[in-house]
Amino acid sequence: MAGIDRRGFLKASMASVAAAALAGCASQQGTSATPKAAGKSVMGLVVPKMAEVRVGLIGVGERGVGFIHHFNNIEGARITAICDTDPLVISRAQKIMADYGRSQPAYYSKGQQAYLDLVAREDVDIVVIATPWALHHPMAKAAMLAGKHAFVEVPMGMTIEELWDLVDTAELTQRNCMMMENVCYGRDELMVLNMVRQGLFGELLHGEAAYIHELRWQMKELDRKTGSWRTGYHAQINGNLYPTHGLGPVAQYMNINRGDRFDYLSSMSSPALGRAAYAQREFPKDHQRNQLNYICGDMNTSLIKTVKGRTIMVQHDTTTPRPYSRHNLIQGTNGVFAGFPNRIALENHGRGSFHEWDQDMEHWYGKYDHPLWTRMGREAEQNGGHGGMDFLMCWRMIYCLRNGEPLDQDVYDGAAWSAVQPLSAASVADRGNSRDFPDFTRGVWQSATPLGIVE
């Protein structure tokens, strides 16, 4: 949502971020405690088939505008309602809908609670939420309580309490709450998942994930766009602010929540130097960007231990000058795949010595491309969205709902992956001492069916 009450929202958002950070540090004793279930598990939830999926969009700004295009290009999906309090993006949405020759949906734009009118509509089946982080939890919860399935941008929530609340609400209402981790639908990530399922790397031992993406330029976005609200987090939380893009695929490789789960985490941050230096260089001394105390370390490194003993390194750096990377590394007893750039080394079934990287991916694409990408990859690339992963994610969401199949990601995945943010902040504040992950599945991970290779 591009502009929720503009400056007023930005101040309120900063306050909520500070409260979330303080709550996270104050409530670390007993983070692994499992509350009583509010309803039955939604692991593998299947809902009645929908001939048509009626879509309500909350937030059609920098991120959400893409969903207007994607759902207009997916058979069986129809946008029936749109909410955003920024009149400029509402006008843009109206034009896009007209350009597609579609009937105009209902629009809601008056006040911060306008989304409640959208989720109450009878002609909305799913609510897709692409708003600033602090709004993900209340909007997803409201959608489920109104009988809708919630699809929310990353992260799913910002505190352990929020994450448990969304798990409980999903179980109580028997509604889907999917955090839309689009990177799980990238060609490379899907291929590696297929390789892992076919046993190419042997028994899995270790993974590496990251969000390394220089975004200092967003500090110049003051009244609208992502930087207008995202910059403030660097002055409120010292930890991994944005863990899920790299972590989601690695978690799927390892069958997290479906045979294994995150056990505990230890985290450390480097000094926080880059944001302040950038502000001093790019803005006047009395500018608002020079009034912030940037505390989030330029590089955060967290180590996750799983119940089965595997390890995952997760890094976050949106400040230093370096090439983009999500790492996307998975190491097994027979070899390793690493991304950025893609390369592979195998002891058996490789094409050379495992002492040297094989970087010829065309061979491996030809042999291990995921069936879903083989089927939909060309259409996904034509429709765009981070190389097609965004479109493929949306297509798969609609496909599952129309065909009565469980979603590829569920509320337990969103909770576990998002929990890295508050747990890393608490660990950093405590000299890197470990923090336990809650078992959001309440033990169901031990018997849940692993994510399959769908076509």
Swiss-Prot record:
Keywords per UniProt: Glycosidase, Hydrolase, NAD, Signal
Binding site for substrate: Y211, R230, Y242, P243, T244, H245, Y324
SUPFAM superfamilies: NAD(P)-binding Rossmann-fold domains
Alphabetical list of Gene3D superfamilies matching this protein: Dihydrodipicolinate Reductase, domain 2, NAD(P)-binding Rossmann-like Domain
Pfam entry (one): Glyco_hydro_109_C
Function: Glycosidase.
Protein name: Glycosyl hydrolase family 109 protein
Organism: Shewanella amazonensis (strain ATCC BAA-1098 / SB2B)
Classification of source organism: Bacteria, Pseudomonadati, Pseudomonadota, Gammaproteobacteria, Alteromonadales
